[in-house]
């Protein structure tokens, strides 16, 4: 019989590391083979750089067994055992399937390409040892292109089926904290097989190759599991190619600018809140109940973010199909009144911090008597390099000199200010300053 120890790979060492945790849960795991069924879901959630740790452990083990030095091994040179982690050649993690399925040649192919954004909500997430990890309750999908924007959308509530025993409170709490869809007796929920068949007809109405489907990387495990779970109850089984939106945006940037943006920047681009309450974004039920979390809204906001970021780079005129124009224009407009208020606040802060608090009452009285047309000059004066006390006196003198009817009032003000400032140590009289 072959030597079973020779088949140790990265997954073997990952399972070996998880055994103590599984035993603390009370699971009957005596060896690695017993723990493998409980670790597959956690392994799928790991990123490539996290899996590299266990791959290195497997390479070191094979090196110790003398398996890597033989000429019959058909491994690439970059995967030979290296003791120093700094010498490891990093693997390219740009998701090659994403780039090959795009088949983009030039800007016209980018603009005319059709993309489907999908999301499925669940009543929480059950522990890894449970056979049913998720309970799908809502699905949303949009058909999108850079040129046309959102071309069509699909939405449906899903009957999650029977809640596993002992997890009803857990599922109810997860629902109440997010989408608030009832976990049972929800009249809008449809059969899982029917929903999946309707989704297939939406994304693949004509014969031919099935298009790739995109979702956020954080939702990929849940969406992929729900699709396979729903396919079990359907007579039509189709393995959809589920890719990540982050890799799609990276591919578009690489095609257009020949350089790759960071995944952190891509995630910050997609995680925005400016369209959370935009009209025609959430489904009708979530809109009527004023609930923020909606599967259809997640898909539409992905399209909004991509349009907002990439459409201008391709010279596309934004329409209602790209972004909610009313909210988009409101978020990019600045009213002059806001600028004036900020300028006034800035001047008041500068006056208070400079120690000349005795000019505050005079300045406030002057501002209340200043017409609206003087606001731009005030905002301009605040950027000069003169002292705050000098600016205040200058504005006072200019406004008084422009009013010929207030000459008598000016003489009274001169006398009062002179008598007041003569009492302060280190200050000259008002007449000497003028």
Curated annotation (Swiss-Prot):
Pfam family for this entry, one: HMG_box_2
Keyword Transmembrane helix in annotation: no
Ranges annotated as spanning the membrane: none
Gene Ontology annotations for the cellular component aspect, listed alphabetically: cytoplasm; nucleus; P granule; piP-body
Location(s), subcellular: Cytoplasm; Nucleus
DNA-binding residues (ranges): 4-73
Keyword Nucleus recorded: yes
Function in brief: Plays a central role during spermatogenesis by repressing transposable elements and preventing their mobilization, which is essential for the germline integrity. Acts via the piRNA metabolic process, which mediates the repression of transposable elements during meiosis by forming complexes composed of piRNAs and Piwi proteins and governs the methylation and subsequent repression of transposons. Its association with piP-bodies suggests a participation in the secondary piRNAs metabolic process. Required for the localization of germ-cell factors to the meiotic nuage.
Residue ranges, annotated region (Disordered): 62-94, 357-385
Keyword list, A-Z: Cytoplasm, Developmental protein, Differentiation, DNA-binding, Meiosis, Nucleus, RNA-mediated gene silencing, Spermatogenesis
PANTHER family: PROTEIN MAELSTROM HOMOLOG
Source taxon at top rank: Eukaryota
The family this protein is said to belong to: Belongs to the maelstrom family.
Gene3D superfamilies: High mobility group box domain
One BP term from GO: male meiotic nuclear division
Oligomer status and interactors: Interacts with SMARCB1, SIN3B and DDX4. Interacts with piRNA-associated proteins TDRD1, PIWIL1 and PIWIL2. Interacts with TEX19.
UniProt xrefs under InterPro entries: HMG_box_dom, HMG_box_dom_sf, Maelstrom, Protein_maelstrom
Ranges of biased composition (kind: Polar residues): 357-371
Name this protein carries in UniProt: Protein maelstrom homolog
Annotated GO MF terms: sequence-specific DNA binding
């Amino acid at each position: 019989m072959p030597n079973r120890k020779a088949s140790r790979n990265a997954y073997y060492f990952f399972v070996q590391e998880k055994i103590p945790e599984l035993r603390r849960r009370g699971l009957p795991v005596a060896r690695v083979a017993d723990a493998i069924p409980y670790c597959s879901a956690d392994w799928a959630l790991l990123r490539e750089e996290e899996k590299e740790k266990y791959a290195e452990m497997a390479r070191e083990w094979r090196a110790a067994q003398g398996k890597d030095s033989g000429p019959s091994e058909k491994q690439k040179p970059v995967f030979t055992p290296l003791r120093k982690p700094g010498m490891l050649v990093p693997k390219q993690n740009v998701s090659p399937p994403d780039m090959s399925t795009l088949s983009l040649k030039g800007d016209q192919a980018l603009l005319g390409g059709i993309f489907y954004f999908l999301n499925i909500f669940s009543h929480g997430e059950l522990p890894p040892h449970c056979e049913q990890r998720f309970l799908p309750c809502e699905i949303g999908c949009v058909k999108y292109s850079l040129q046309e924007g959102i071309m069509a959308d699909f939405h449906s509530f899903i009957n999650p089926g029977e809640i596993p025993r002992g997890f009803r409170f857990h599922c109810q709490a997860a629902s109440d904290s997010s989408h608030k869809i009832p976990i049972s007796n929800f009249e809008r929920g449809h059969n899982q097989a029917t929903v999946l068949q309707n989704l297939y007809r939406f994304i693949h109405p004509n014969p031919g190759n099935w298009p790739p489907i995109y979702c956020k990387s954080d939702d990929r495990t849940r969406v992929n599991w729900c699709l396979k779970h729903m396919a079990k109850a359907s007579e039509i089984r189709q393995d959809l190619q589920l890719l990540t939106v982050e890799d799609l945006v990276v591919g578009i940037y690489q095609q257009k600018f020949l350089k790759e943006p960071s995944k952190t920047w891509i995630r910050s681009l997609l995680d925005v809140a400016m369209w959370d309450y935009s009209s025609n974004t959430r489904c009708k039920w979530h809109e009527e109940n004023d609930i923020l979390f909606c599967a259809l809204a997640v898909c539409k906001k992905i399209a909004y973010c991509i349009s907002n970021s990439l459409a201008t780079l391709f010279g596309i005129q934004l329409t209602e199909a790209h972004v909610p124009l009313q909210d988009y224009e409101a978020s990019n407009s600045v009213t002059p009144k806001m600028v004036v208020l900020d300028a006034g606040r800035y001047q008041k802060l500068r006056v208070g911090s400079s120690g000349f608090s005795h000019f505050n009452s005079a300045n406030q009285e002057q501002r209340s008597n200043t017409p609206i047309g003087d606001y731009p000059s005030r905002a301009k004066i605040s950027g000069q390099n003169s002292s705050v006390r000098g600016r205040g006196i200058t504005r006072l003198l200019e406004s008084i000199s422009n009013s010929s009817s207030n000459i008598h009032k000016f003489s009274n003000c001169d006398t009062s200010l002179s008598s007041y400032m003569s009492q302060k140590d280190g200050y000259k009289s008002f007449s000497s300053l003028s």
